[in-house]
Each structure stands twice: as C-alpha cells, then as structure tokens.
Amino acid sequence: MSQKNGIATLLQAEKEAHEIVSKARKYRQDKLKQAKTDAAKEIDSYKIQKDKELKEFEQKNAGGVGELEKKAEAGVQGELAEIKKIAEKKKDDVVKILIETVIKPSAEVHINAL
C-alpha cells in the first residue's frame, strides 16, 4: 500500500507541477498580449503627435511660400514697368533709325560674296 501512496503522491505532485507550468505559460501569454497592446497604443499616440507636428510645420511654412511669390511678382512687375518706360523713351529714336535705313539704302558687298 505504501507503493500506491508513493505513486499517488508522485502523480499529485506531477499534476501540481503541470498546473504551475500552465499558469506560468498563461501568465506569460497574457503579459505578451498586454505588451503588444501597450506598444500599439504608444505607436498610435506617437503617430498622432508626429502628424500634428507635420501639420503645424506645413501651416507655418506654407505662408512663407506665398510671401515669396508675392515678392517675386512685385519684383517682376517693377522690372516690366522699367522696361516699358525705357522702351517708351527709345521708341522715337528706333523709328528714326528704321526710316533712315529704309529711305537711304547703302550699297555694300556682302562678306560671303567675296
């Protein structure tokens, strides 16, 4: 009968050890799931933060491009106004030169004809 008690004790100890191992595995799996969930939450919050920073950066720098465009356009308009003013001053001289050239042709031999 002592053999039966010894075997029963061993079986009971094996069963308890199996339960302890099962609990440890379940605990580890639960911890892994919790860690994955926490990591996903942290990643989402980090992504939201970076998206917010990107939007702020875009808004901050989008206005700068508009200002540069306005300055460039003003510079171009100023240069065009200056060119038109110079053209208006020189218009009479150009017309005189054209009329003289048409009325008084000069006979020259072209350099390729020689």
UniProtKB/Swiss-Prot annotation:
Q: Which Gene3D superfamilies match?
A: F1F0 ATP synthase subunit B, membrane domain, Single helix bin
Which key words tag this protein in UniProt? Acetylation, Hydrogen ion transport, Ion transport, Membrane, Transport, Vacuole
Superkingdom field: Eukaryota
* Gene Ontology CC: fungal-type vacuole membrane; Golgi membrane; proton-transporting V-type ATPase complex; vacuolar proton-transporting V-type ATPase complex; vacuolar proton-transporting V-type ATPase, V1 domain
> A GO BP term, please?
Golgi lumen acidification
Q: Give any GO molecular function from the UniProt entry.
A: ATP hydrolysis activity
Q: Which InterPro entries match?
A: V-ATPase_G
In the record, N-acetylserine modifications are located at 2
Q: Which Pfam families match?
A: V-ATPase_G (PF03179)
Q: How does it sit in the membrane?
A: Peripheral membrane protein
- Keyword Membrane part of the UniProt annotation: yes
Q: Where is the major localization of this protein? A: membrane
Enumerate the subcellular locations listed in this protein's record, separating them with semicolons. Vacuole membrane
Q: Subunit notes for this chain?
A: V-ATPase is a heteromultimeric enzyme composed of a peripheral catalytic V1 complex (components A to H) attached to an integral membrane V0 proton pore complex (components: a, c, c', c'', d, e, f and VOA1).
Similarity field:
Belongs to the V-ATPase G subunit family.
Any extra detail in the entry? Present with 2280 molecules/cell in log phase SD medium.
Q: What does this protein do?
A: Subunit of the V1 complex of vacuolar(H+)-ATPase (V-ATPase), a multisubunit enzyme composed of a peripheral complex (V1) that hydrolyzes ATP and a membrane integral complex (V0) that translocates protons. V-ATPase is responsible for acidifying and maintaining the pH of intracellular compartments.
Record-given protein name: V-type proton ATPase subunit G
What is the species of this protein? Answer: Saccharomyces cerevisiae (strain ATCC 204508 / S288c)
Q: What gene is behind this protein?
A: VMA10
